[in-house]
């Protein structure tokens, strides 16, 4: 199984935090890891090969 992940946003870290006036404006590394794990564990009857991860506040 091959999967393609698009990480479209900054990743929160101890050295790089989000502004106080923009909560949830950066991706949480633990949430990214959980998304990878979920793809690994997905059932074969509902298969994906691409997943895009963006912060909640991003406008389309």
Residue ranges and their predicted role:
Residues 2-12, 19-60:
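C-terminal helical subdomain
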């Amino acid at each position: 199984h091959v999967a393609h992940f698009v990480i479209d946003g900054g990743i929160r870290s101890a050295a790089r935090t989000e502004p106080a006036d923009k909560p949830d404006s950066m991706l949480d590394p633990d949430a990214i890891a959980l998304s990878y794990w979920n793809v690994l564990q997905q059932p074969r009857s509902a298969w994906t090969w691409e997943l895009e991860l963006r912060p909640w506040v991003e406008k389309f």
